[in-house]
Amino acid sequence: MRNIQIALTKGRLEKHVIPLFEQIGIDCSELKNKGRKLVFQSKNTDISFILVKAVDVATYVEHGVADIGVVGKDILMENEKDIYEMLDLGVGVCKFCVASIPTYNPKSYRKKCIATKYPHITSNYFHNKGEDVEIIKIEGSVEIAPILGLADAIVDIVETGKTLQENGLIVFEEMYSISARMIVNKAALKTKKDEIFSIINMMEQEILSGK
């Protein structure tokens, strides 16, 4: 088996995904005791893992540094990359939502100002609804934007809704459901076809058996 390099997202999604790899027989012990390391070798397979920021996973896969990547659908929707999206892993499930303070009126004809970390997704969503909105990109916590009057509402990923609730915001629209996706480098799918499809097929069977 030729070596397969897999790029994973550091943080919350990583914790959802590691058990899936373990369930298909891939040793992930180094990942679970990583310290400050960012590159890890599976002890029982020719598979190595790299841990990178979520926004960089698709970039590493697109440029062939990683053969396979696992990343949230939000990253793929916001950043168009020349990769193959192969499998919905069904973990890390969240929703894109429009949220604001209780006095927000989503039916108002006035041009709205929306704060978000995801300007591309937000622009497409409101464009498809026929609404002209001003979009302000914010890198940090967007919840504060409608509270301080910077924006009428926000578009953000909501998992439990606890952060919104703690800041006095409510969900007005659920836009899209998102989850972790397995992506593959286009060239690698040709040169390492058997190895990659072996991982994908085992993962797919594991997901189906768990439903």
From Swiss-Prot:
GO terms for molecular function: ATP binding; ATP phosphoribosyltransferase activity. It catalyses: 1-(5-phospho-beta-D-ribosyl)-ATP + diphosphate = 5-phospho-alpha-D-ribose 1-diphosphate + ATP. InterPro entries: ATP_PRibTrfase_cat, ATP_PRibTrfase_CS, ATP_PRibTrfase_HisG, ATP_PRibTrfase_HisG_short. It is an enzyme of class 2 (transferase). GO terms for cellular component: cytoplasm. PROSITE patterns: ATP_P_PHORIBOSYLTR (PS01316). Transmembrane segments: none annotated. GO terms for biological process: L-histidine biosynthetic process. Its EC number is 2.4.2.17. Keywords: Amino-acid biosynthesis, ATP-binding, Cytoplasm, Glycosyltransferase, Histidine biosynthesis, Nucleotide-binding, Transferase. Heteromultimer composed of HisG and HisZ subunits. NCBIfam families: hisG (TIGR00070). This is ATP phosphoribosyltransferase. It comes from Bacillus anthracis. The gene is hisG.
